[in-house]
């Protein structure tokens, strides 16, 4: 149905955005830990 083709890209974008945010947070945490050493 047409609804799927509309909602699917939104779900993909949301997943991508959340993964990107999580990755940036991990990098930030790693840099913070490195700055403590």
Curated annotation (Swiss-Prot):
Stimulates fluid secretion by the Malpighian tubules. Increases cyclic AMP production. InterPro entries: Corticotropin-releasing_fac_CS, CRF. This is Diuretic hormone 1. It is found in: Secreted. One of its GO terms (molecular function) is hormone activity. It holds the Pfam family CRF. The keyword Transmembrane does not apply. GO terms for cellular component: extracellular region. Keywords: Hormone, Secreted. Inhibited by antidiuretic factor A. Belongs to the sauvagine/corticotropin-releasing factor/urotensin I family.
């Amino acid at each position: 149905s047409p609804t799927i083709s509309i909602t699917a890209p939104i779900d993909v974008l949301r997943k991508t955005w959340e993964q990107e945010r999580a990755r940036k947070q991990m990098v930030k945490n790693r840099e913070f830990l490195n700055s403590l050493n």
